[in-house]
Amino acid sequence: FENNPVFAANFTPEAGNEWDTYFGNSAKGNPNGLIDRAQINDSYVIFPQSWAEVADPLLMEPAEALITINNDFSISNNTLTTNIKTEFQQDIEGSFKVIVCITQDNIIAPQKNNDPEIGPTPIDSTYVHNHVLRGTLNGSWGEYVSTTGTVAMNEVYEKTYYIEFPASWIPKDCHVVAFVYNESNKQVLQAEEIPVLN
């Protein structure tokens, strides 16, 4: 579909492409997903029939970190200021990074569809795309919270980021998503999401 003008909308930012290559989602065949980037049977990729089985035990684990997001959006210059605060809830060994992303909902663009029960086939020209990754504010792999090999309970990492929104990003439909992960195995400890306009 890359050369098909019907699918001109590009939903593949640099970070998304890098993650797809590293974790192997497209290579395994869609649909699939990652759950906290946990590896199951030496694979990050988990198929829909296993999502609940993998996610339910993870939801029962105590939080290792908390993330607080505070946004300030300037309508006049289309600029977001977001403060990300990560507070660790226990002593943990490892080096950790934080990634800050922008996602967008309510984007109407063509989507391939083989199921007439959910929409027109073979292409749904008015499909509503949600949770579309628009990009990151601190690179594809984020920034180190700690490189000492350990973080202590109640240790806090805080940083403020700025970004000017392109005209195609609709602030009322966008969210800031932040997550902290273990750099060695890429597993996510905690994530948070709030609207850009809150």
Where are these regions (language model features)?
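Short, conserved sequence motifs used for protein processing/export or organelle targeting and
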Residues: 1-198
